[in-house]
Amino acid sequence: MSAKQSKAYAEPDFWSKKAFSEGYPARSVYKLREIDEKFDFIPNPKNCNALDLGAAPGSWTLFLLRKFNGEGHIVSCDLNELAKNVKGDNLTFIQGDLNDAAVREKIGSLGPYDIVVSDAAPLTTGNRIVDTARSEQLVDMALWYAGTMLKTGGNMAVKIFQNGSQQALLQKMRGMFESAKGFKP
């Protein structure tokens, strides 16, 4: 990492500061908020069952918790722990590898789900080809969960690295869902 890159990570930008001031562990919360506002993504939370894949540090989970306001249920899964302030009586956190059969079984036992979200990102290497391939694997895994555990008519939001192959992933999603749109919040 160059000195310029490392400085960018050392100093929080406007969105990071805003997220922290609102109690969110990361600025990624604004992606899901904008998706929800633009597409009315999150249904009535009263009976909603949500799955957050690759959830740590927990901004998307916390957004769902606040949106649900104690109703519905959220299942979040990640290799890493959620931030300490991401908690609720209607939250089940599973720490583990999404590829692990026991984790899949546990997540499946708590479904089916009305929405599946994934802001999962691989540990980046700096090699665009490697990082993109790893990101695509995470998207494919999220699509497997959605295809297996999402209720008919359910919604999914997933982060895809912009690399040229996102059109192929969108095409795959169009075969799975009533509609699929690329959107850059």
Language-model features and meaning:
Residues 1-45:
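Class I SAM-dependent methyltransferase Rossmann-like catalytic core
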Residues 43-44, 68-69, 149-150:
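A generic alpha-to-beta junction signature in SAM-dependent methyltransferases
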Residues 45-56:
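Conserved class I S-adenosyl-L-methionine
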Residues 48, 72, 154:
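Glycine-centered, small-residue-biased loops immediately flanking beta-strands
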Residues 51, 83, 127-185:
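C-terminal substrate-binding/active-site "lid" region of AdoMet-derived donor-dependent transferases
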Residues 57-70:
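Conserved SAM-binding loop of SAM-dependent methyltransferases across substrates and taxa
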Residues 73-78:
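Conserved SAM-binding motif I beta-strand of class I
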Residues 79-123:
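S-adenosyl-L-methionine
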